[in-house]
UniProtKB/Swiss-Prot annotation:
Name of the protein in its database record: Cytochrome c oxidase subunit 1
Gene that encodes the chain: MT-CO1
Catalytic activity: 4 Fe(II)-[cytochrome c] + O2 + 8 H(+)(in) = 4 Fe(III)-[cytochrome c] + 2 H2O + 4 H(+)(out)
PROSITE patterns registered for this protein in UniProt: COX1, COX1_CUB
Bilayer topology annotation: Multi-pass membrane protein
Family: Belongs to the heme-copper respiratory oxidase family.
Residues exposed to the Mitochondrial matrix side: 1-11, 87-94, 171-182, 262-269, 328-335, 401-406, 479-516
Any Pfam family the entry gives: COX1
Residues that coordinate or bind O2: 244
Cross-link (1'-histidyl-3'-tyrosine (His-Tyr)): 240-244
Cofactor binding notes: Binds 2 heme A groups non-covalently per subunit.
Residues annotated to bind Cu cation: 240, 290-291
């Protein structure tokens, strides 16, 4: 029965598929919003109206991409599909809670869209800083709807995190230890811990903002003894772990893809990779104020946050060089998924280097709120998280559907996307160094050339997105069945065929040797 299978689902594979479809749909919305932004900035002068509507679009673009595209696909889609298969569990620990985690997202998305349709919309930026987000600068229901939307998405993520942690710790067969689980499983577990620890702080912050707006409290209002800087601390204590939440599952996927297409049976430096991810997770919690170098902190505070931020580069470097070492001496297969993984390693590293630049508090004073920051985080998200998602998608597509994508189209798609995102975001480094500020719908003529090039790049990326939709349709219409999958002994998820049966691992797996 359709309703029983898709609305009341308790099957990790079906819920994973729902997350994938929802994330893809939200991704289209987010892409549309980003095209609006680049159309507005394609030449000087106004296109859409005033800066309020522009900032509503920017804010919605960020929220949609983060909470309704990257997280649902990476954690909800790939996590649900792969974690139980990789550890040999029959399903997730709490299958009905899993269903609830998913179904909290569509209403959350609805609230976010509603926020932009009432009053003037929430033009606050994704950070929702007061006093701009207060009830004077943003009278009306828009910001309140946005806050409720975040609450729902947050509850969804917390429930999902509890589910993943329980599943990964308790549902492995007795024979395998935590240090024999695949790296993607590790990455999801660490991500879940980060979610569990950071989201309640965001919930507290936005709830205080809600009461400031509606119940006359003054948590963030100096007139009543409050402090808007407190909100920034609460927000970024969530916001910084959040960016690692967005990338960590990608690290896990890239490890699998690189290992698989290098023909290796395990990644280079498995334990180093695990420790690196745990270090990144831990350090992610103690660097939040590097987003606040411009609020007037003590020099010793700035010194600490600068050095702590730079330390994160070390475990990140361990990961990058371990991926390169995994490639070394391998029998490399230049499949589309491998191209995405190699693109990820290269572009994520560039994004990491600009991150090191921004971690210097003195430099950040100059570069804060310029397009240099936009370029930095889009290199790690738009070419890190998204490339990992695309690589994981083309790699596991045969597992999810039982059909194969057209290899040539997939490679063309990668090439167009690669050119598009680089043409969009590389020029933004120059704009930022030249002092162009973020979150403005217009700019002095001096910035025209790079903005025009950047906007052209965004339309190239749009072409790639449309091509991807065609590619998926072509694969599902042609129904080319998967012949055989190599290397199944070291990649448990493929063991049951493509696609795997509705129920897998109904009894614990038997492990012959201590090594997985």
């Amino acid at each position: 029965m359709f309703i029983n299978r898709w609305l009341f689902s308790t099957n990790h594979k079906d819920i994973g598929t729902l997350y994938m479809i929802f994330g893809a749909w939200a991704g289209m919305v987010g892409t549309g919003l980003s095209i609006l932004i680049r159309a507005e900035l394609g030449q000087p002068g106004s296109l859409l109206g005033d800066d309020q509507i522009y900032n509503v679009v920017v804010t919605a673009h960020a929220f949609v991409m983060i909470f309704f595209m990257v997280m649902p696909i990476m954690i909800g889609g790939f996590g649900n599909w792969l974690v139980p298969l990789m550890i040999g569990a029959p399903d997730m620990a709490f299958p009905r809670m899993n269903n609830m985690s998913f179904w909290l997202l569509p209403p959350s998305f609805l609230l976010l869209l509603a926020s932009s349709m009432v009053e003037a919309g929430a033009g606050t930026g994704w950070t929702v800083y007061p006093p701009l987000a207060g009830n004077l600068a943003h009278a009306g229901a828009s910001v309140d709807l946005t806050i409720f939307s975040l609450h729902l998405a947050g509850v969804s993520s917390i429930l999902g995190a509890i589910n993943f942690i329980t599943t990964i710790i308790n549902m492995k067969p007795p024979a395998i230890t935590q240090y024999q689980t695949p790296l993607f499983v590790w990455s999801v577990m660490i991500t879940a811990v980060l979610l569990l620890l950071s989201l309640p702080v965001l919930a507290a912050g936005i709830t205080m903002l809600l009461t400031d707006r509606n119940l006359n409290t003054t948590f963030f209002d100096p007139a009543g003894g409050g402090d808007p800087i407190l909100y920034q601390h609460l927000f970024w204590f969530f916001g910084h772990p959040e960016v690692y939440i967005l990338i960590l599952p990608g690290f896990g996927m890239i490890s699998h893809i690189v290992t698989y297409y290098s023909g290796k049976k395990e990644p280079f430096g498995y334990m180093g990779m695990v420790w690196a991810m745990m270090s990144i997770g831990f350090l992610g919690f103690i660097v939040w104020a590097h987003h606040m170098f411009t609020v007037g902190m003590d020099v010793d505070t700035r010194a600490y946050f600068t050095s702590a931020t730079m330390i994160i580069a070390i475990p990140t470097g361990v990961k990058v060089f371990s991926w390169l070492a995994t490639l070394h001496g391998g029998n490399i297969k230049w499949s589309p998924a491998m191209l995405w993984a190699l693109g990820f390693i290269f572009l994520f590293t560039i994004g990491g280097l600009t991150g090191i630049v921004l971690s210097n508090s003195s430099l950040d004073i100059v570069l804060h709120d310029t397009y240099y920051v936009v370029a930095h985080f889009h290199y790690v998200l738009s070419m890190g998280a998204v490339f990992a998602i695309m690589g994981g998608f083309v790699h596991w597509f045969p597992l999810f559907t039982g059909y194969t994508l057209n290899d040539t189209w997939a490679k063309i798609h990668f090439t167009i996307m690669f050119v598009g995102v680089n043409m969009t975001f590389f020029p933004q480094h120059f704009l930022g160094l030249a002092g162009m500020p973020r979150r403005y719908s217009d700019y002095p003529d001096a910035y025209t050339t790079w903005n025009t090039i950047s906007s052209m790049g965004s339309f190239i990326s749009l072409t790639a997105v449309i091509l991807m939709v065609y590619m998926i349709w072509e694969a599902l219409a042609s129904k080319r069945l998967v012949k055989s999958v190599p290397l199944t002994t070291t990649n448990l998820e493929w063991m049951h065929g493509c696609p795997p049966p509705f129920h897998t691992f109904e009894e614990p797996v038997f492990i012959k040797s201590p090594q997985l």
